[in-house]
C-alpha cells in the first residue's frame, strides 16, 4: 500500500508537470509569433493545440544517433540525469496549503542543492559528445550556472531574514499581510535576472547560442536524448518561476485579504502568478539581444554579487534596528 500511495503521489506530480512543459513550448511559440506579428503553429489541431503532441511523437519515433567517437554510457546518461534532477526538485514545492509531496524544513536548501547538481548533466553531455562545439557550450554553462548560483543564494538570504524559515509553506504564510515583492522589489528584479541566467534563457542563453555554437552542449543529440534536455530546460523554467511565486508573490495566497477571493482554489492563484512570470521569460526572449560572454560574467560577479551582498547587510540592519526579526 505504501508503494502504491508513493507511486500515485509521484504520478500526480510528474504528469501535470509534463503537460505544463509541453504546452509551455506551444505558449512560447504563440506569444513570440504574436510579438513578431506572425501566426505561429496553427495547423495541428484547433489553433495548433495538438502541436506539442505532434512534436513529442516526432522526437519519440526518430532514430537515436550515437556519435562513433562519443563515450556512449555517459552520453546516454547525461540527458536522463538533467531531466530527473528537474523533476526531483518539485517534491518540495507547495501548490497550496498542505498540497506538497514533502514539506521539509530545509526546502530552500534542498532546491539550491538540486539546482547546483543540474550542471553535471550538461557538462558531462558536452564532454561525452567528443565535439568541440558541445564541450564549449558545456563549459560556458558550468561557469554561468556557478556564477549566478552565488547571487541566488545571497538573494535568498534576504527572503529568509524576512520570513525566519527555510520551509516554503512558512515563507508563504509569512506573506499574509504583505507580499515580499513590495518591500523587496529591487531584490526581486535581481532574483529574476539571476534565474534567467541560471536556466540558460535569453538574453543569457550563451551555452546554446545557435548562431555561434550550433545549439551548444546538445548539438550531438537527437530523438529522445534531445527531448529530455528540452523537457529538463522547460521544467527548470517552470520550477524557477514557481520558486519566485513562493518567495515574492505569496505563493497560493490571493492578492487581497477578501473572503470572496478565498473561494477560488489556491492552486489557481499559484498557477496564475507562475504563468505571469513565465510570460516574462518569453517576452524577454523576444525583446533582448544575447549578451556577450564577458558581459554575462561581469554582470554576475561585478554587479549582481556585490549588490545582493549589500542588500543582505541593509535588510539585516533594518530588521535589527526596528526589532522586526521574525
Swiss-Prot record:
Function (record text): Core subunit of the mitochondrial membrane respiratory chain NADH dehydrogenase (Complex I) that is believed to belong to the minimal assembly required for catalysis. Complex I functions in the transfer of electrons from NADH to the respiratory chain. The immediate electron acceptor for the enzyme is believed to be ubiquinone.
Sequence intervals crossing the membrane: 1-21, 41-61, 72-92, 104-124, 152-172, 177-197, 234-256, 268-288, 303-323
Keywords for this protein: Electron transport, Membrane, Mitochondrion, Mitochondrion inner membrane, NAD, Respiratory chain, Translocase, Transmembrane, Transmembrane helix, Transport, Ubiquinone
Top-rank taxon, per record: Eukaryota
Annotated organism of origin: Chondrus crispus (Carrageen Irish moss)
GO terms for MF: NADH dehydrogenase (ubiquinone) activity
Subcellular location: Mitochondrion inner membrane
Uppermost EC category: translocase
Family label: Belongs to the complex I subunit 1 family.
Protein name: NADH-ubiquinone oxidoreductase chain 1
A Pfam short name: NADHdh
Cysteine disulfide links: none
Swiss-Prot/TrEMBL catalytic activity: a ubiquinone + NADH + 5 H(+)(in) = a ubiquinol + NAD(+) + 4 H(+)(out)
InterPro entries in the record: NADH_UbQ_OxRdtase_su1/FPO, NADH_UbQ_OxRdtase_su1_CS
Membrane protein topology class: Multi-pass membrane protein
Biological processes per GO annotation: aerobic respiration
GO cellular component: mitochondrial inner membrane
EC number: 7.1.1.2
Main location: mitochondrion
Coiled coil: none
